[in-house]
Amino acid sequence: MDKSEKRFERDIESFLISPAGGYTQFCGQDAEGNWVHTRQHDVSKCIYMDVLCEFIAKTQPKEWTRYTKYYGVQAVDKLYHRLEKAISNQGLLYVLRNGIEDMGCKLKVCFFKPESDLNPVTVERYEANILGCTRQFRYSTA
């Protein structure tokens, strides 16, 4: 009898990536059974920057164009450092609610469910949120 939490973990993941859960699976198993990321997970930063940039570009194209025009090839790295600083200084909930601002660009990192569906733009932005599911990571300080 398996006394580990693997079955429990698998059940949670199965629900989250089902149509009812609404999440996208960010990792899967290869032919040898090893877990591999389907998105670009940055281990040192512990974030999927490609997913965040995709979300911002899709939901806030004008701001993202301005941001990338200003920073050029460094845009993704600058975004990460600004995000990290904002979370450290103001807290994660503040950043989720208010987004970040850098060089005059206001960038939201998520959109909350609108009170009503009268404004189709707010509904569209809410539905554009990218919720990802990744199996737990092995952590080591060694």
Label each residue range with its predicted role.
Residues 1-142:
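An alpha-helical interface "stripe"
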